[in-house]
Design a protein with these regions (language model features):
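N-terminal secretory signal peptides
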Residues: 1-25, 32, 36-40
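Cleavable N-terminal signal peptides
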Residues: 36, 46-47
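Short, glycine-/small- and polar/acidic-enriched structural segments
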Residues: 49-181, 187-190, 196, 206-212, ...
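Pocket-lining segment of extracytoplasmic ligand-binding domains
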Residues: 113, 187-281
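Secondary-structure end/capping motifs
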Residues: 249-324
Length: 341
């Protein structure tokens, strides 16, 4: 496989923090953009008296909670309630949900699989809302010269994925759709995306499963071909979680958070070039990587629906069959519909 095209390729997988001047500059740009994007399209919810002095929000970069943080709009919206905002960044969203269950956070986002693991472990987290599906944001790459041309050609091949990751679910669904199971391939479980790429580039595996922005980074920086993505197999959703007692007790705060978050989503959908600029500067990765990821991403916040429950239930059932979770779960039992989206 050819060497990376970008000298900053490694930084894509280990993004550093940005400085204060960059944050202030981006905040001014986003504030103007969101004002133009939403106009009067979203009304503010009526504000009931809140007894919450601080709301603690956990987030990971490359997410719309991150965009919302940059604007400062949430702080202004919550000011009449006397509620301040404390933002806490996490490298992986599994730590976000762990912090919520431990009482160190009030609300945060995580991937679909993490929600299933938390429920199976009896953590008591509640799903509050979902982001729009992002099926093209997860996929499998093979070298451009590889003889592997279809999913069926993966039979007997070594494939790098993360155990219990979105790539694990996607691979399982794709194989089953082609009359195979995981036992028909040689799965190599790897935890970190940087290690995924190292094994792939060293030729130790025939294919690698990744998710954006790491998938886009690998597509840009290596001589690879996308074998398949999540289209038709997975929604690859992000969900927002909280402890149910917190969400019920502070529904006014939760509703304001989601109102402002949807404004950030609308802005991101309407102004992709600004999103590219924001994330490429913030993550310190080449703009063409974020451009590729942004083109296939649809931003939006949605209420929990029966269709979403069925989608998430299938993931839970697959993980049970793969013995990734210790017991069956009914996903609907963890859905908390408070009419906040």
């Amino acid at each position: 496989m050819s060497r990376p095209k970008h000298s900053k390729f490694r930084s894509i997988f280990l993004p550093p923090l940005t400085d204060a001047s960059d944050r202030m500059q981006r905040r001014r740009v986003i504030l103007k953009g969101i004002s133009a994007a939403v106009g009067a399209g979203l009304s503010m919810p009526s504000l009931a008296q809140s007894t919450l002095p601080v709301v603690r929000i956990g987030y990971q970069k490359f997410n719309t909670l991150n965009i919302l943080k940059e604007t400062g709009y949430l702080e202004k919206a919550l000011a009449p309630l006397g509620t301040k905002v404390e933002w806490r960044e996490f490298l992986v969203t599994s730590l976000v949900t762990e912090a919520i269950t431990a009482g160190a956070l009030d609300i945060g986002h995580a991937s679909d699989g993490i929600g299933v693991f938390q429920q199976a472990q009896g953590k008591g987290l509640a799903y509050l809302a979902s982001e729009s599906p992002y099926p093209e944001g997860v996929g499998f790459l093979v070298p451009s010269h590889s003889p592997i041309k279809s999913i069926r050609d993966l039979k007997g091949q070594k494939i790098a994925i993360g155990r219990g990751y979105n790539t694990h679910y996607l691979l399982t669904k794709a194989l089953e759709a082609n009359g195979m199971t995981n036992s028909d391939v040689d799965i190599v479980y790897i935890q970190l995306p940087s290690d995924h790429l190292a094994a792939y580039q060293a030729g130790k595996v025939a294919a690698v499963g990744l998710w954006d922005p790491f998938l886009a980074a690998a597509q840009v920086a290596t001589d690879s071909r996308l074998l398949f993505d999540g289209t038709g197999f997975t929604g690859n959703r992000t969900y927002h979680f909280a402890q149910p007692n917190f969400a019920k007790a502070h529904r006014d705060v939760v509703k304001i958070i989601f109102t402002e978050l949807e404004k950030a989503n609308q802005w991101a959908q309407r102004y992709p070039n600004e999103v590219i600029d924001l994330f490429s500067r913030q993550l310190k990765i080449p703009p063409d990587v974020i451009t590729l990821a942004t083109k296939r991403r649809r931003y939006g916040l949605t209420a929990l629906t029966p269709a979403i429950a069925r989608e998430q239930q299938d993931l839970a059932d697959v993980f049970l069959r793969l013995k990734l979770i210790p017991k069956a779960v009914d996903v609907k039992e963890a859905f908390l519909n408070l009419d906040v989206v």
